[in-house]
Amino acid sequence: MVMSLLWALLQDMVLAAIPALGFAMVFNVPMRALRYCALLGALGHGSRMLMIHFGMDIEPASLLASIMIGMIGINWSRWLLAHPKVFTVAAVIPMFPGISAYTAMISVVEISHLGYSEVLMSTMVTNFLKASFIVGSLSIGLSLPGLWLYRKRPGV
């Protein structure tokens, strides 16, 4: 069981690093930072997968994983002398809820084509809200480390 979890984690991390690297290339990230974008995307997606595996819902798992991405990205930006967004934006993209958003949009199309049904409406609302909460948690999670770590005056 442990080996299958480790294999699934490794597979998840490798498959998450590929789109993180691709979006980093689309965003013209400097060549020296590309491997860090891929590594950060793999770490974020892998940590979210582990949290989901151990019973956490996808929304708070996405929040915690994006907070982790933001904190590591800020530390790496100081080390590599680049803006944190260079690392964090491309790294968080593999965690966007494509399946939930796609299912919600398919339900909208089926409602307009076939007419209203309670099952389609329920599917649409459920998947739309799930996708919205995941995107919200990703954006909040990316912004919180900057608010915490760049604060100049005391909190009290």
Curated annotation (Swiss-Prot):
It comes from the Bacteria. Keywords: Cell inner membrane, Cell membrane, Membrane, Transmembrane, Transmembrane helix, Transport. InterPro entries: ThrE_2 (IPR024528), ThrE_Dicarb/AminoAcid_Exp (IPR050539), YjjB (IPR020914). It is a multi-pass membrane protein. It is found in: Cell inner membrane. One of its GO terms (biological process) is succinate transport. One of its GO terms (cellular component) is plasma membrane. Its main location: membrane. The chain crosses the membrane at residues 7-27, 54-74, 86-106, 128-148. Involved in succinate export with YjjP. Both proteins are required for export. Belongs to the ThrE exporter (TC 2.A.79) family. The transporter is composed of YjjB and YjjP. This is Probable succinate transporter subunit YjjB.
